Amino acid sequence: LLSKYIRLNNYEVLEVVHPSDHKTLTQLTLLTSKLGIALKVHDDPKFISSAYEFKNWAEGKKSLVQEFFYRWLRKKYNILIEDEKPVGGEWNFDSKNRVSINKLKEDPPEREKIKPDALSVDVMVDVENVFGNNFGDLENFNWSVTREDAEKKANEFFNSLINNFGPFQDAMDVGNPTLFHSLLSPYINVGLLDPMKIIVAAEKKYYEGAPLNSVEGFIRQILGWREFIRGIYWLKMPDYKSLNFFENTRKLPEFFWTGETRMQCVAKAVESTKELGYSHHIHRLMVTGNFALLSEI
């Protein structure tokens, strides 16, 4: 369809935002080559650093460490930097962000229930018809679908949740799968929220009195891990998807889909993902991901 449209209008250049996956970029490259036209790829505004910038940063380094890339970006954009040094004298306050859920003195605020508009309801019906067996239950759908509403969710996080985000970001609770997590990543990933604006808003909360360990930990998730993993992806692809460092061969067990296992941590992580279509990074890293690593999957 795209090829036909380009020929019909005699276009000489195809301009696109940098795709999110290598396959799409390859397809666009092959298409424009076949048509004999130029391909102009613009940086993806959903990310702060470009694939080209990350490649330049990585060049010549024996090992690529997220922490060092994160520090480099902090300096570049002057985030939590005073007199060319990190605020608080440290780059990373993770040592303060591993508090047990048993130490929690207050329940997390109730998340406001979002009433879907007519268009969202129509889309939800289509999703149920086509993807009814996939993870997620539409009865639990509680996501904003406009920029204005996504910004309201960001403000709710900064006003009600960020103070406890840091200490309890690695904690898990059977009765509350989201705790003090921001739930903002989907909005950033689809372009409803600008990552740098969210980082600046978080930094502002620090100067208004929010704990540094919470603010720094939150910023690191976006400026550090999100940017670093994306950079690694584009640096290593297409070979990256077929790498198997540990040479593991076991397949995922059935309970990764059903949640039916006596291991309660795994069962609850899978069950909440099935219900919400969402899983925060500790569920993924320390439960399902860690199980897969230890089980040689």
Kindly give the residue locations of the regions a language model identified.
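A generic structural signal for short
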Residues: 16-17, 172, 258
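Mid-sequence acidic-hydrophobic segments that form the walls
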Residues: 31-34, 157-160, 225, 272
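Active-site-proximal binding-pocket segments
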Residues: 183-184, 188, 193-297
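Beta-rich, aromatic/charged-enriched effector core domains that present basic-aromatic interfaces
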Residues: 2-143
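Glycine/tryptophan-enriched, flexible segments
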Residues: 77-218
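Short amphipathic alpha-helical segments, especially helix-boundary/capping motifs
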Residues: 4-5, 131, 159-161, 172-178, ...
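Residues forming well-ordered secondary-structure scaffolds
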Residues: 23, 64, 68, 149, ...
